[in-house]
Structures are given as structure tokens and as C-alpha cells.
Design a protein with these regions (language model features):
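Extended polysaccharide-engagement surfaces of secreted carbohydrate-active enzymes
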Residues: 172-335
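Aromatic-lined, polymer-binding surfaces characteristic
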Residues: 3-220, 226-227
Length: 335
């Protein structure tokens, strides 16, 4: 509430840090408003929405910036819709259409539609949130974008086959898979179906891949581009709920117990609250599986003697190729 309004300030060619902070602020504030109905959250969230809606653009030359900003504004617009001033709704919806949806149809900016990495997942999720937010006023155009996204996002989802291995490694699993989960989840909420996306080979197994990457030290097996421990991962709660497998949250439970979640950087944190509904902490037990093997284009194997206790032995080994997205010359590396 005390932070200065965001400005359209690029770092190099990117507005991404502003888009991500906008998503964090708007997601947190709109969630707080719906939870508490305290006017201070509504007023500040409306200000945030209007501020970014009045930017001259959302930097389509680096489309991740547009995707995250579109998702941010769409969440706020939808969750606050009945409480926003009429003039604000007009400004915000116009921004979603002109600065989010329209540039996604320009071939100069939408090469991600054919990509097989996190860009496809993030951009399709952001644009779909935007299309759903303005669906009532733009039904035909919105439906076309949603149908396009369903076809397009199937491309990177094929990369999870056959076992759930994510080629880009630990850190980018947290990015690409989280936005893929947001995409699948919103389709189910609105249309009552996931359009068979959840049944893509390997996708529902990928939560086990991510959980097994964490060793007894609490650090991940850090191959490919990896910034180290990410902390609480909201998408894991979605998988645990879908699969009715609380053991997928064993590491997340440890993060909660040790406060390893950062409200200043985890812009998707409110989603954990939504997806954790109905999951009891007492039901979260140690996973039975101690060996995980993932085939695909960046093969990896992890094994351990136990999950916690202080005397565990953990081994991680990878094969694969350095040519995958965010890959390194690390075939044969191990921990």
C-alpha cells in the first residue's frame, strides 16, 4: 500500500520486471479485497490497474512482458469488476484489448505460438486470461484467441512426455509449468473442461519430477539455467489436489514450516491459497517413491535413501543435450 506507483521503465529491451511487479501487486491486492472487503485494497488495486493501463504499450517486442501484464490486469479487472468505477472499467478493458490481445495477433510478435518452451506457456496463459476477461464485450474475437491458445500450448506440453521431465530444469519448471497450470485451471473453471490438456502424456507426472529435484540439503539439482532454491511453489498445490496425492507437498510443507516463501517475489502466491483449499497439512506424508527417472530430450535420474531426517544420501544424474532451451554443456553432470 505504501509503494510508489509503477512506471514504464525498461531494463535493456525488457519491461518484464514491471509486468511481474504489476502481477504481484494486483493479484495480492485483489485477493485481499475479496477476502477482507477493506476499501483500502480496492482503491489501491484500482490505482494500479489504471496506472499500467495508461502505459503507451506493454512492450510487445519482448512478449513475455505483455503476457504477464495482460494476466495481471485481467485478474484485477475480473475480480474487482463489480466494484470498479465505470470509467475505470472502460480504460482497463480497452488496455487489455489494445495492449494485450491485439499485439498477440501480429506476426512480428507472436512467434511464441510455435515454440516448445516456457514462452509459449506463459504467453498463451496471459493472452487467454485477457480474452476471458473481455469475453462479454468481444465474444467472437476472444473465443478465437482461446481456441488458438489451446492448440498452441499443446506444443510445449508434448515436451513432458513420457515421464514428466521438464527439459528446461528446475527454475524454468517453476515459470513455464506454473503458467501452464494457470491456463488449464482457468479453462476448467470457465468451460468445465480442460480440453484433454491434463491428459497430455507426462504432464500430471511432472509434479513428481519437480519434487524429486530437491535434495536433503533443501537445494535443487541445479542443471540448466537455475537460480537456486525457489521456495514455495503454488502450482504444486494444484497437482496435489488434482491427483489426490498430498505427498507431492512434502517439500512445500517444509517451506511453510520454515517460512521459505517470499511475498516480495512470489507473484503467484495467492494461487496457493486457492489450490490448497481442502488439503490438510496432517495428510501430507513423506513420498513413498525414492527413485525418479525421466526420459525425453534432457534425461535425468534422482534417487535417495529417504526424504528427511538428517542422514540421507541423494544422487542426481543427467544426460541430455545442451541444445534444449536454457540448456548448458552439462550432459553427464551429477550431484
Amino acid at each position: 500500500l505504501s509503494l510508489e506507483p509503477l512506471q514504464r521503465t525498461l531494463i535493456g529491451r525488457r519491461l518484464l520486471q514491471v509486468s511481474r511487479e504489476s502481477l504481484r501487486r494486483i493479484f495480492f491486492l485483489s485477493y485481499a479485497w475479496r477476502l477482507t472487503h477493506k476499501k483500502k485494497f480496492l482503491a489501491r488495486c484500482e490505482d494500479e490497474l489504471l496506472t499500467v493501463s495508461k502505459f503507451n504499450d506493454w512492450n510487445p517486442s519482448h512478449f513475455l512482458d505483455v503476457a504477464e501484464m495482460t494476466m495481471a490486469v485481467s485478474i484485477g479487472y475480473d475480480w474487482l469488476f463489480n466494484d470498479l468505477q465505470a470509467k475505470s472499467r472502460e480504460v482497463i478493458s480497452k488496455a487489455i484489448i489494445e495492449k494485450g490481445l491485439t499485439p498477440s495477433q501480429d506476426s512480428k510478435y507472436n512467434g511464441w505460438l510455435r515454440g516448445s518452451n516456457n514462452w509459449n506457456q506463459v504467453c498463451n496463459a496471459g493472452i487467454t486470461f485477457g480474452a476471458l476477461a473481455v469475453y462479454e464485450s468481444q465474444p467472437a474475437a476472444s473465443l478465437a484467441l482461446i481456441e488458438r491458445a489451446i492448440k498452441s500450448i499443446a506444443i510445449p506440453m508434448k515436451e513432458y512426455a513420457p515421464d514428466g521431465n521438464y527439459k528446461e530444469g528446475y527454475s524454468y519448471w517453476g515459470y513455464g509449468t506454473s503458467f501452464n497450470v494457470l491456463f488449464n485451471n482457468v479453462l476448467e473453471k470457465i468451460f468445465g473442461t480442460d480440453f484433454n490438456l491434463n491428459s497430455q502424456p507426462g504432464f500430471m507426472q511432472t509434479a513428481s519430477f519437480y519434487e524429486n529435484l530437491i535434495g536433503p540439503s533443501g537445494q535443487p539439482f541445479s542443471y540448466s539455467d537455475c537460480g537456486g532454491i525457489e521456495g514455495l511453489q503454488p502450482a504444486m498445490f494444484w497437482f496435489a489436489d488434482k491427483l489426490k496425492d498430498p505427498s507431492l507437498l512434502f517439500i512445500e510443507k517444509k517451506y511453510l514450516q520454515t517460512s521459505k516463501f517470499n511475498v516480495k517475489s512470489n507473484r503467484l502466491l495467492p494461487a496457493a491459497m486457492l489450490w490448497a483449499n481442502g488439503i490438510s497439512v496432517k495428510d501430507i506424508k513423506e513420498p513413498a517413491q525414492k527413485i525418479w527417472n525421466g526420459n525425453g530430450g534432457n534425461e535425468v535420474t534422482m534417487m535417495r535413501t529417504s526424504w528427511w531426517g538428517g542422514k540421507e544420501i541423494y544422487v542426481g544424474y543427467k544426460g541430455g543435450s545442451p541444445s534444449v532451451s536454457h540448456g548448458h554443456m552439462d550432459a553427464g553432470s551429477f550431484v
